[in-house]
Amino acid sequence: VTFSFDGDPDFISFFSGEIGHEYKHRNRIEMQPEDVEKCEINFSIVYDYGNAKTIEGSTHILISDQFGGISGNNVEKDKEAVTNCDWTELVSQEDLPKATKVTKDYSCPLTSYLGKEISIAFRLNPLDNSATMPVIHIKGLQLNLEFNNGKSTTINAKNFEFSALNVTYNLDDLSKNNTHLTKLKEALGNKNLTLEEMKSAEYADKIAYTTVDGNIPYFWRISQPNDFVTSGGSKDYTKGDTWLISNPILLNGSCDPDAGVAIKNISQTLEIYSHTYEEAGTYTATFVANNANYVHQGGQV
């Protein structure tokens, strides 16, 4: 299509009317629910160690639009908030892996949560310790939104701002493996801590929120965003309860405004302009003409 012009404005921008280039959406920064074609969270789960008995019922993948987040400075209040929150199982127990070394991929739709603040939680709470308990890997976590204007948004794991809440753990069990205990000491910032010091009230509050750089029982490793890990521990270890919970995320379909194309500036002349539409259809083509200098700016659509 070729367009002809009269006059000589300083600047002209062109909105073709195609998806992503509609003048009516030039100021839009948030999609409406009806504009969202897909909203889903994707991740994989695989277990190391454990058996069918210790794996069963050990894991919960949860979502809530009622959780206000982890404070990080009041353990009892945070435990109460997590316990009393109305969580929904994002993945049913029947759909979780039943054995080790079996990777399962999940794509969970979240369209019903559009416009709400959601928190995602991963919880390891083994019910059976008659054998080695599972090590769980949460891999490739992403939140994906696709819009009807052809654009998309991806939120990666590191942008979820996860916090740990270690509700139940046993330092005596952890001390049976010196490497495991050392990893926790490193996470606490003091490799010279004694076991008794770690059991003190001072460190109990710190340990409740601690993540570690290693694969040890009772604590999450989140230093590798594409592979969150925690472990249940050896046979007869205390059955732990450890959570990894995201900050609330607003599912508002944020998007970039539709953009026009600058086809003329003050140093150019323009009498005709051609644009090729790749698909047949009805489009509203819009030209925005502006004159501007240091004392005045005006325009016409």
Locate the predicted segments by residue.
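Short, solvent-exposed loop/turn segments at the edges of extracellular beta-sandwich modules
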Residues: D128-S130, N290-H296
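Aromatic sugar-binding surface patches on proteins
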Residues: A99-D105, L251-E271
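Exposed low-complexity, polar/acidic, P/S/T/G-rich flexible segments that act as propeptides
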Residues: S130-K185
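Residue-level signature of extracellular beta-strand-rich folds
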Residues: F3-D6, F14-F15, Y273-H275, F287
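Residue-level recognition of secondary-structure-to-loop junctions
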Residues: S267, E271-E279, Y283
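Long, low-complexity, polar/charged, intrinsically disordered or flexibly structured peripheral segments
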Residues: D205-A262
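Extracellular carbohydrate recognition and processing domains
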Residues: V75-Y113
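Extracellular beta-strand-rich recognition modules
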Residues: C39-Y49, G57-T59, I63, K116-P126, ...
